[in-house]
């Protein structure tokens, strides 16, 4: 038994660490594990690791961090800091594990690379933003800035590396 979250994705992104902690307490009561796809793998990587460690500390649940990596250029050099934090949590008696996939790639929905302000009220709001010429221009400008002031998984990467790989309807192209 366990619980898995995708905190980079909507609607999981709306859960705060206190809610996660309370849910993880239930998981712990059944001897389960809490697996987290952390809130950030980009600009706020260390803070996202700290959030996972906080949940472990406060709930007593075993925690698995999915896809632990320092892939984006802004995070190069942060691995030792990340591992020290995990080791310190383990030294305090917390069960913390992590996994990592063996390739250099990233996959997400288009929603995840949009500025926070453009998606904060869900998909319907994002569609309305994209239909508005002025707001669409602001989205493009914000997505083109590097470094971003929001957690953009594309920050520091080149757009020619992006591959669109699936659509529900041809009209979405």
Locate predicted features.
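Active-site neighborhoods of metal-dependent hydrolases
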Residues: 1-9, 13, 20, 24-25, ...
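Extended hydrophobic/aromatic segments used for targeting, binding, or gating
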Residues: 18-61
